[in-house]
Amino acid sequence: MLENKNHKKISLSGKSLLMGTLSTAAIVLSASTANAATINADNVNENQTVEVTASSVNNENNKQVTEKDSADKSTSDVAEDANTKKSNENTETTEKNTQTVVTNAPVSDVKNTNTVTAETPVDKVVNNSDQKTTNAATTDTKKDDVKQVEKKDSVDKTNAEENKDSSVKPAENATKAELKGQVKDIVEESGVDTSKLTNDQINELNKINFSKEAKSGTQLTYNDFKKIAKTLIEQDARYAIPFFNASKIKNMPAAKTLDAQSGKVEDLEIWDSWPVQDAKTGYVSNWNGYQLVIGMMGVPNVNDNHIYLLYNKYGDNDFNHWKNAGPIFGLGTPVIQQWSGSATLNKDGSIQLYYTKVDTSDNNTNHQKLASATVYLNLEKDQDKISIAHVDNDHIVFEGDGYHYQTYDQWKETNKGADNIAMRDAHVIDDDNGNRYLVFEASTGTENYQGDDQIYQWLNYGGTNKDNLGDFFQILSNSDIKDRAKWSNAAIGIIKLNDDVKNPSVAKVYSPLISAPMVSDEIERPDVVKLGNKYYLFAATRLNRGSNDDAWMATNKAVGDNVAMIGYVSDNLTHGYVPLNESGVVLTASVPANWRTATYSYYAVPVEGRDDQLLITSYITNRGEVAGKGMHATWAPSFLLQINPDNTTTVLAKMTNQGDWIWDDSSENPDMMGVLEKDAPNSAALPGEWGKPVDWDLIGGYNLKPHQPVTPIPNVPTTPETPTTPDKPEVPTTPEVPTTPETPTPEAPKNPVKKTSQSKLPKAGDKNSFAAVVLGAVSSILGAVGLTGVSKRKRNN
């Protein structure tokens, strides 16, 4: 009995020892394998290759850009970074979700901007042009997505190898396409190995139209657009808008008045504005000792767009002295709105107004029409008061002819939500013979219409053949750029009016003065000024209305805004315009769009007695309180622009008070000048603005939500993007679902065979993992046997 009992003890001890050994081995091997999988996930994330979408072909360097290499990139690659972040989704995007690039750095941090976009050799552009941009994981890929990422990497690698093979060797059963005519020479001259072109690429190249005749006036080309963006990024002092002293900017006192829509006294904003001018010289008219200005005004954060008459003593530079005569078209007109235009005096002292009548009844699609009306005024001189007596002859002058200019019906037939409609901003000008014209913003008609075919118009590109080829493949390889290019057809149009001054109609319709097919869908607020024997045409534009995502995203990232004024010059009013400064750039943004000193809607006014200078007026673009609660859109300080005889321009360091429309000896006020220094007394930024991210949902629209409100406004979304130390932020700054495990693994687990959490399990198919599972299973069986034996012994004892 004793020997038998000892034998059982020895046998039991051996089983227990074997069980413990196997269990320990399984646990150690499982843990090390899981840890290896986790490390592997980190390595995949850190070394993930970032595919580059090229927009230029000037650089012959063939290196691939990886996430690791990006640390060595210069600021010239800034557009590439923006495009990689946003365009890689390769989906059709709207204005809301494409404007997502933010700036957290001062403008002065921009150092090297030799190019707007990352440049790639022609052969690399060609080989990648027909592929969708990658959706591969970047450094923020979650560890539990590693299997999917690796699977995709494997597929991408296989596809890349197949594409490489197919680009070199034609398919056995397919006929190799051939380049034809002029495009063949261009491709070969650009250094592309034609044997590596796919049939699809060759077919796309063969569609290119090399016609050299412009169909719709002078063209703003794709190359011009890139140059304008590059100039903005570089902050060239000849074109950068001067800095204003942010502490001196204030809301317009005269903007507190009866609102046209509500009929109540409201604190209104004011934006697009224009003086009553002599239609021939462009000088501000002197109406009975007063200067008159018409401006768009409305309640913040409301779709409220109407025009008001403002007045001040002629030559008075004091911003506080402006008064408001009220809305020109009266009260209670929410459906019919009035947008920008121009105005001149009639011989009887009445104002002939040209404006944009906007019908919003069709689902707020803003049906725009050029209109005219005669405005009669009352003057109570002893009370220093001007009022609107009555308005006559209010009628539609022009809303497109379908051929030169797109009509509303044409637009509505094809609009899918990505197409802008434009028939607005009529500017009046008389030629030397007394003929009257309107220059206006529009879209091209069937003469040179929007559509896919514009992508194949070589004339739209405007660079060297090599540059154009790279841009061509850039457009084809990016779905958002391609879609924008298809719809882009902005134009600056011109019509001649008949001799009925107070009730004008169209006498002749001309081809556009400027057009931007494939390049931009919005060039607005045209302004023509005659200086000496030349006509100078200016217009404002937002680059994010253009097709080249890489370019405008680069400006957003570098400066924080993408607005500009472009300019052209001609010996003739109705045709023959050439761009100023080679690309057309005249003014570029210099501060982020949500700073108190950001501006837009630039309007050039002649300086009396000078044929080489213009006074540039604009408004502070704080619509919807984007710069902070209570900071409204208001008139900006004006500044001088020098016009040089060689068709170049230079911004001068001459600045006025806010709302100065007449430059004279008393106009200059150096106190309004600012600097780009964070803590300077005359800084261009208010406290808290330096480094503040730009929320592009708030910029450039007509229904804007408040930005960082102190007190919530009823019925208006109040989600500040970067709250200033909130007690209870509406949007948590930490993720709702933490990236760390909710139940952390204990430092000293009591149960040595506790199941590993799912996020740390090894990958399926791993040999070590399989061995660990087998060992774990064996140990579990032996453990069960051992525990059973123990239980039996306890019961027997």
Swiss-Prot record:
Site for Transition state stabilizer, residues: D425
Biological role: Fructosyltransferase that catalyzes the polymerization of the fructose moiety of sucrose to produce inulin polymer and inulin oligosaccharides such as 1-kestose and nystose.
Disordered, as annotated region: 54-176, 708-766
pH dependence: Optimum pH is 7. More than 85% of the activity is retained in the pH range 4.5-6.0. Activity decreases sharply at pH 7.5.
Propeptide feature: residues: 765-797
Protein name according to UniProt: Inulosucrase
InterPro entries, A to Z: Glyco_hydro_68 (IPR003469), Glyco_hydro_beta-prop_sf (IPR023296), LPXTG_anchor (IPR019931)
CDD domains, alphabetized: GH68
Basic and acidic residues: compositionally biased ranges: 65-75, 82-95, 140-167
Major location (coarse): secreted
Protein residues bound to Ca(2+) 1: N317, D660, I662, S667
Chain positions recorded as Ca(2+) 2 binding sites: D419, Q450, W487, N489, D521
Catalyzed reaction equations: [(2->1)-beta-D-fructosyl](n) + sucrose = [(2->1)-beta-D-fructosyl](n+1) + D-glucose
Temperature-related activity annotation: Optimum temperature is 55 degrees Celsius. Activity drastically decreases at 60 degrees Celsius.
UniProt biased composition (Low complexity): 130-139, 718-740
Cofactor requirements of the protein: Ca(2+)
Pfam family membership, one: Glyco_hydro_68
Upper taxonomic lineage: Bacteria, Bacillati, Bacillota, Bacilli, Lactobacillales
Coiled coil: none
GO molecular function, one term: metal ion binding
Modified residues (Pentaglycyl murein peptidoglycan amidated alanine): A764
Species, as recorded: Lactobacillus johnsonii (strain CNCM I-12250 / La1 / NCC 533)
Annotated EC: 2.4.1.9
Gene Ontology cellular-component annotations: extracellular region
GO annotation (BP), single: carbohydrate utilization
Subcellular location: Secreted, Cell wall
Polar residues compositional bias, start-end: 54-64
